[in-house]
Amino acid sequence: MKQPSSSVRGKGPAKAKARRKTREELNQEARDRKRDKKHRGHAPGSRATGASASGKSSGQSTQKDPRIGSKKPIPLGVSDAQETRPQKHQPQPKSEKPMLSPQEELDMLENDERLDALLERLEEGETLSADDQAWVDSRLDRIDELMQQLGLSYDDEEDEEEEQQEDMMRLLKGGN
């Protein structure tokens, strides 16, 4: 009752048995494989030619060799080199602070509110932090430098006061 069906057994129609190859056919296939195997790999001289051979096969235009430089003639004489190359002026870096004359800088330092406040604290006997003390010292040193440049000194002011007192004494004494 049960009959074997061909569709259940195989996935398609029944195949005929494959016939065995003869020794000549096997030898011919082996020779073909050997010939194909010989031609595998890179072509001779491919290291030297390199990218140009692969570039042509891909259809791109030929690439320029990066090792070859400019064709522009280079002058070998000293005088020629100076004439052809214009001298470039490098711009000087601008300082953050505008350049002030020594008198203007001295006036600015004397009117500095932070310096005045720190000097008042020092006169009152307070001790300043190391940063504040270093800043005050640097400002006072700069004031001294500027006064020396301008030819001013603290002694000049004291001398002027003494001279004024002497002049007043002369006027009071008798007028010569």
Curated annotation (Swiss-Prot):
Residues 1-110, 151-176 are annotated as: Disordered. GO terms for biological process: ribosome biogenesis. It comes from the Bacteria. Residues 22-33 have a biased composition (Basic and acidic residues). Keywords: GTPase activation, Ribosome biogenesis. Residues 154-166 have a biased composition (Acidic residues). Residues 12-21 have a biased composition (Basic residues). Residues 43-61 have a biased composition (Low complexity). The keyword Hydrolase does not apply. One of its GO terms (molecular function) is GTPase activator activity. Interacts with Der. A GTPase-activating protein (GAP) that modifies Der/EngA GTPase function. May play a role in ribosome biogenesis. Belongs to the YihI family. This is Der GTPase-activating protein YihI.
